[in-house]
């Protein structure tokens, strides 16, 4: 092929009329790939050297394969005319490569068939620009294959680049695309050429994994500050020189140095760098709003009013909200306690009163709107004065519906009642008292009349600061003064033990001269309370009851002092003596006390102490053998008898109706005779005053000769002691009176037990305790017995605990002789009663093999 013909063909216009178009015509030349022919008008057959081609390639700014340019546009090429068919088809192929159209004419298909084997052949590209020069560049097979791939791939890439590369804020999808393909920044608006991008991608594919660039891309994951264009150039390519500068361009080192939380979080995406850097966070805004006002958290729009009107409105709202913490209610004990020591304004202590007054003022305003009366107007005027603090709060009666609504406005104070102490002054306490009174009036709750009887001084508001005073309150809710309350209540309790004692032991008062009067008067008090005391008992005042109690004692002492010494000595002689106690049932300590009471030295032997006490008791009983005449005792009133009994420290009993003048061991009769005589006295006890004439030996009505002293001595276990030593000294009694008092502590005798069984009246049997409970009490109260000759002698209670068989006859005999005497019981029990008691308690009991002939 001749080069001159090629040059001449380049000057000839093509047949399709595209003389000024740029086209590329591939021509197969059987030569080496590095051979490039440059046709010039001056030297048309001088080829360029390879070094010249390499230099042109390195200096090309677009990284294209350097093309040799030759001047002289009027060169003729004859050989191109011979190959006109190939030259005619070449512009179509160039249009296909540039425009990316998919239309393939028949000539192009033939060209494709003809050039199908060009992969293995060398190609030469000829470019004609405006007909001035020819550019001839050799193409290798490898680059041809890459060129075909680059054309198809770069078409799509170029479209994506042109579609996404705009001067706006990129979306996260665009950022990911840019991270994969580094963006190029051309200064002109032309589309990037296909050859540049394909060459860069080829170099990236042949460069390996590029671990350093991947590490730089990982730094983009950290949450850094976002600018208006959140684009990070990892290749450290700064803004282009075309005038469109990037605001936020960080390098890898800058990102790493800025990594961390600086305390400022930017949530806005607006292009305002000063807002992102200097703007306060949300929490700081909340703190500032809470510092300047007590209102809730305001939004940024609320904290930045736009106009002056909005500023004035917001300032008014802030002023209103600032006052609210001063009027906060104290609903916990902690707030009340800490309010005394906190450095707050002085209105903190008046919170409760102000809230109550404000609530009442609102209610008065509602009353005015509903009723419209002049009273509501007056109430409103007074409430205005209350706000100013000029006078005490005055409350009016409101309608019932509004009064019930007032319950909803009541304050709740959390805490125990003993801790609800108020630290207000006396004036404030008075205001609180007025408030409580008004609430009671509005609720129409009448104040009970009992409170007046308790004294007005008790309802005074408490000024003490202890918790106990705060816990006690009256019916109106006010605090009581605990120091002024008389908690003794002695006069009210005077009748209580007497009533209990009557229920236990069947005590009846001697309110008349016969047994019938005693049985009817079952509701009277103890012996030291007369009819005048009964009237005083009905009075509720505690102070008056105390005075009544003292007056009763003084009246009793006056009666005793008014008696002559002869009457007192006669009364002492007339006092029935107790029967001989069973000293064998006493403990050693009790025996030692009895011996010491008689003035003897301590004795070690138990038997000697018992014998000595028996002799002392017999000698003492012989000294009181005189018997007074019956007519001298019948005219005495009941008050004198009660005075004498109080002097002697004895308590009256309903079953012990008559008194025995004197008693000695010589006059102890047989059991059968005594029982017959007692049965006669029991039958005659209902005949009234007639009995006094038939039985001259007795005082009132009872003919029993052995009742009183036995019963009184049976109750003498800690109960029949004299009231006080002053009472016994006022009576100017005989010398042996202290000995009688010591003897009262002794248990009862057999005569006392026998006499009590027949002397119990019908009315008193219902009040006596059951025998089962008395047996249990007697068994448990038995003192421990000293060992005899090294052998322990267990008590009945210890035998029961050890599951020893209990002999019924022995236990019944012990109860009748000494067991009941320990608890002051006068009745007797038989073996059958003891058996029932044992079976009810689950106690093992047996009968004796030889039945005893004695009747107990």
UniProtKB/Swiss-Prot annotation:
GO terms under cellular component: Slx1-Slx4 complex
Comp. bias (Polar residues): 1-19, 296-309, 673-686
Biased composition (Low complexity): 51-60
Start-end of Basic residues biased regions: 139-152
Subcellular location: Nucleus
InterPro entries, sorted: Slx4_ascomycetes (IPR027784), Structure-sp_endonuc_su_Slx4 (IPR018574)
Pfam family, one: Slx4
Keyword annotations of the record: DNA damage, DNA recombination, DNA repair, Nucleus, Phosphoprotein
Gene Ontology terms, MF aspect: 5'-flap endonuclease activity
Record keyword Cell cycle present: no
UniProt record, GO biological process: DNA recombination; DNA repair; DNA replication
Record's keyword annotation contains Zinc: no
Modification after translation, per record: Phosphorylated in response to DNA damage.
Spans annotated as Disordered: 1-24, 39-61, 88-121, 139-201, 296-326, 362-392, 621-640, 653-688, 715-742
Subunit structure, as described in the record: Forms a heterodimer with SLX1.
Family to which the UniProt record says this protein belongs: Belongs to the SLX4 family.
Described purpose of this protein according to its UniProt entry: Regulatory subunit of the SLX1-SLX4 structure-specific endonuclease that resolves DNA secondary structures generated during DNA repair and recombination. Has endonuclease activity towards branched DNA substrates, introducing single-strand cuts in duplex DNA close to junctions with ss-DNA.
Protein's name in the database: Structure-specific endonuclease subunit SLX4
Organism of origin: Ajellomyces dermatitidis (strain ER-3 / ATCC MYA-2586) (Blastomyces dermatitidis)
């Amino acid at each position: 092929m001749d080069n001159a013909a090629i040059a001449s063909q380049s000057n000839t216009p093509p047949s399709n009329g595209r003389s000024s178009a740029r086209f590329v015509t591939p021509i197969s030349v059987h030569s080496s790939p590095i051979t490039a022919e440059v046709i010039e008008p001056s030297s048309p057959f001088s080829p360029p050297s390879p070094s010249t081609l390499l230099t042109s390639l390195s200096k090309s700014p677009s990284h294209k394969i350097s093309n040799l340019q030759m001047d002289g546009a009027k060169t003729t090429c004859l050989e191109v005319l011979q190959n006109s068919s190939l030259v005619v088809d070449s512009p179509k192929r160039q249009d296909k490569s540039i425009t990316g159209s998919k239309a393939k004419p028949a000539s192009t298909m033939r060209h494709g068939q003809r050039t199908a084997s060009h992969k293995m052949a060398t190609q030469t590209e000829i470019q004609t620009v405006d007909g001035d020069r020819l550019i001839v560049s050799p193409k290798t097979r490898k680059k041809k294959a890459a060129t075909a791939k680059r054309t198809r791939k770069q078409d799509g890439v170029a479209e994506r680049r042109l579609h996404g590369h705009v001067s706006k804020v990129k979306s996260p999808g665009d950022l990911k695309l840019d991270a994969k393909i580094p963006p190029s920044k051309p200064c002109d608006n032309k589309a990037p050429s296909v050859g540049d991008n394909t060459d860069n991608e080829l170099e990236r594919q042949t460069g390996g994994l590029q671990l350093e660039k991947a590490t730089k891309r990982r730094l983009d994951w950290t949450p850094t500050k976002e600018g208006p264009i959140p684009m990070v150039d990892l290749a450290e390519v700064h803004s282009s020189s075309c005038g469109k500068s990037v605001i936020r361009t960080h390098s890898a080192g800058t990102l790493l140095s800025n990594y961390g939380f600086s305390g400022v979080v930017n949530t806005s995406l607006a292009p305002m760098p000063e807002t992102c850097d200097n703007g306060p966070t949300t929490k700081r805004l909340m703190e500032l709003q809470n510092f300047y006002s007590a209102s809730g958290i305001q939004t940024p729009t609320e904290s930045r009013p736009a106009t002056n009107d909005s500023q004035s409105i917001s300032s008014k709202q802030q002023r209103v909200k600032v006052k609210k913490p001063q009027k906060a209610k104290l609903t916990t004990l902690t707030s009340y306690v800490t309010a005394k020591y906190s450095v707050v304004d002085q209105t903190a202590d008046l919170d409760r009163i102000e809230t109550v007054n404000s609530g009442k003022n609102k209610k008065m305003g509602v009353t005015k709107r509903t009723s419209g009366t002049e009273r509501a107007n007056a109430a409103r005027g007074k409430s205005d004065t209350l706000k100013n603090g000029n006078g005490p709060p005055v409350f009016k009666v409101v309608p019932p519906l509004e009064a019930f609504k007032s319950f909803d406005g009541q304050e709740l104070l959390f805490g125990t009642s003993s801790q609800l102490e108020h630290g207000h002054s006396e004036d404030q306490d008075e205001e609180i008292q007025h408030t409580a009174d008004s609430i009671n009036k509005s609720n129409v709750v009448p104040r009970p009349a009992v409170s007046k009887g308790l004294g007005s001084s008790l309802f005074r508001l408490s000024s003490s600061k202890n918790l106990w005073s705060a816990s006690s309150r009256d019916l109106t809710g006010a605090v009581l003064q605990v120091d002024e309350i008389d908690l003794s209540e002695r006069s009210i309790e005077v009748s209580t033990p007497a009533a209990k004692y009557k229920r236990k032991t069947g005590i009846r008062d001697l309110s008349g001269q016969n047994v019938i009067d005693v049985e009817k008067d079952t509701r009277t008090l103890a012996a030291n309370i007369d009819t005048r005391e009964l009237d005083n008992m009905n009075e509720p005042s505690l102070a008056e009851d105390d005075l009544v109690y003292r007056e009763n004692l003084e009246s009793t002492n006056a009666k005793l002092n008014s008696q002559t010494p002869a009457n007192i000595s006669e009364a002492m002689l007339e006092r029935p003596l107790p029967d001989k106690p069973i000293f064998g049932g006493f403990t050693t300590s009790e025996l030692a006390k009895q011996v010491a009471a008689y003035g003897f030295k301590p004795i070690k032997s138990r038997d000697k102490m018992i014998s000595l006490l028996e002799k002392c008791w017999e000698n003492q009983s012989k000294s009181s053998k005189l018997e007074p005449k019956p007519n001298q005792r019948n005219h005495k009133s009941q008050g004198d008898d009660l005075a004498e009994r109080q002097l002697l420290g004895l308590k009256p009993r309903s079953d012990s109706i008559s008194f025995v003048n004197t008693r000695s061991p010589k006059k102890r009769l047989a059991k059968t005779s005594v029982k017959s005589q007692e049965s006669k006295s029991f039958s005659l006890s209902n005949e009234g005053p007639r009995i006094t004439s038939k039985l001259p030996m007795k005082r009132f009505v009872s003919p029993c000769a052995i009742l009183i002293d036995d019963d009184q001595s049976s109750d003498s276990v800690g109960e029949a002691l004299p009231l006080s030593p002053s009472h016994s000294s006022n009576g100017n009694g005989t010398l042996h009176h202290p000995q009688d008092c010591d003897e009262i502590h002794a248990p009862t005798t057999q005569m006392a037990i026998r006499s009590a069984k027949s002397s119990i009246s019908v009315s008193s049997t219902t009040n006596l305790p059951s025998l089962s409970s008395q047996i249990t009490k007697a068994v448990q109260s038995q003192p421990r017995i000293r060992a005899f000759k090294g052998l322990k002698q267990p008590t009945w209670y210890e035998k029961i605990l050890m599951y020893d068989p209990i002999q019924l006859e022995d236990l019944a005999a012990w109860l009748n002789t000494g067991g009941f005497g320990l608890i002051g019981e006068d009745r007797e029990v038989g073996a059958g009663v003891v058996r029932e008691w044992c079976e009810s308690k689950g106690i093992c009991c047996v009968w004796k093999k030889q039945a005893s002939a004695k009747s107990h």
